[in-house]
Regions:
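Intrinsically disordered, low-complexity Pro/Gly/Ser/Thr-rich segments with frequent PxxP/GP/PP motifs
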Residues: 1-4
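Enriched for extracellular/lumenal, surface-exposed ectodomains of secreted and cell-surface proteins
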Residues: 9-24
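Generic low-polarity alpha-helical segments
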Residues: 9-11, 34, 113, 120
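A short linear-motif detector with a strong N-terminal bias
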Residues: 11, 57-58, 162-167
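Short beta-strand elements
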Residues: 23-43
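Residues that flank catalytic or metal-binding motifs in active/ligand-binding sites
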Residues: 30, 43, 74, 109-111, ...
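Local sequence-structure signature of Cys/Sec-based thiol-disulfide redox active-site neighborhoods
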Residues: 37-82
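Short, conserved sequence motifs used for protein processing/export or organelle targeting and
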Residues: 80-227
Length: 227
C-alpha cells in the first residue's frame, strides 16, 4: 500500500512447493486488519535512570546504561532523575513523584532504570528495576516491539535575550484516543554538568540530568487543556 492507516489485508496461499494438488481450498484464504504506519515515522523509546551524587554504585550503573544504549539500534531518549537515593543538588521538585514506579515507593534504590514506564512481568512487577545489562536490553527490545499510537512533532524556539522557550506540538493519532485521559509533558534536561559524585571524583560529568518540566508539574497536562 502507498498510504497509511488501518486496512483490510487478504492473503491467499496457493501452489505450495510448486504443486497444484490441494483438494480443499476453503482454508487457503485469510483476511484481517493491519495498521500501516507512515514511511517516515521514527519511534522513540524513553529510558529514565535513577541516580544520586552520594550513590557509590551509580557510576558503574551509568557505564552499564551507556553501553547498552550505545549498542542499541533504537532511537532512545535518555533522562536521569536524581531520585531514588538521597536528594542532592540536582534533585528537582518533580522527581519525587516518579518514585511511584518503584516496586515499593517507600523503599527505593539506585542505580535504577525504567523503559517507557512499563513493567515486564518476567523481570519485575514494577517499571523500575536495578540496572542490569541483560534486563535493560530486554526492556528496550520489547519497547521497540510495542505499537505506537500517536506521532509527535515538536518544534522549539529559544529566545536567548528573553530566555524564553516556545514550543509547538503537533499530535497525529494512529488509533482512537480519548483526549481527556491523555497527558502531555515536556522535560528539560541538561548535559555535561561537572560536579561531585561518590566513587566518581569532584569533577564527574553528569549527563541527561532532569532539570524540570515546562508544564510545572510531574505528570503534565491534559491534551484538552492545550491551546
Amino acid at each position: 500500500t502507498d498510504s497509511e492507516g488501518e486496512k483490510n489485508v487478504e492473503v491467499e496461499i496457493f501452489n505450495v512447493n510448486g504443486g497444484n494438488n490441494d483438494i480443499d481450498t476453503s482454508d487457503n484464504t485469510f483476511s484481517g486488519n493491519i495498521f500501516f504506519y507512515p514511511n517516515n515515522m521514527e519511534r522513540s523509546i524513553l529510558v529514565e535512570g535513577f541516580t544520586g551524587q552520594d550513590c557509590s554504585n551509580c557510576p558503574g550503573g551509568h557505564l552499564t546504561m551507556n553501553s547498552v544504549i550505545e549498542n542499541s539500534t533504537e532511537n532512545i531518549v535518555e533522562v536521569s532523575h536524581h531520585a531514588g537515593y538521597y536528594p542532592d543538588m540536582y534533585t528537582m521538585k518533580e522527581d519525587g513523584a516518579y518514585l511511584f514506579y518503584y516496586p515499593n515507593p517507600s523503599s527505593t534504590f539506585a542505580p535504577a532504570v525504567m523503559v517507557n514506564r512499563k513493567a515486564d512481568q518476567d523481570i519485575s512487577s514494577a517499571p523500575v528495576i536495578a540496572i542490569d545489562n541483560k534486563n535493560l536490553k530486554t526492556l528496550i527490545t520489547k519497547a521497540a516491539e510495542s505499537k505506537p499510537y500517536v506521532s509527535l512533532n515538536l518544534d522549539t524556539k529559544f529566545d536567548d535575550a528573553k530566555r524564553e522557550l516556545k514550543i509547538k506540538l503537533q499530535i497525529k493519532p494512529h488509533e482512537q484516543i480519548t483526549a481527556d485521559s491523555v497527558l502531555f509533558n515536556v522535560f528539560l534536561t541538561q548535559d555535561n554538568i561537572q560536579g561531585p559524585q561518590s566513587n566518581g571524583g569532584s569533577e564527574y560529568i553528569h549527563h541527561h540530568v532532569f532539570r524540570g518540566t515546562v508544564t510545572g508539574n510531574s505528570w503534565g497536562i491534559l491534551l484538552t487543556d492545550l491551546t
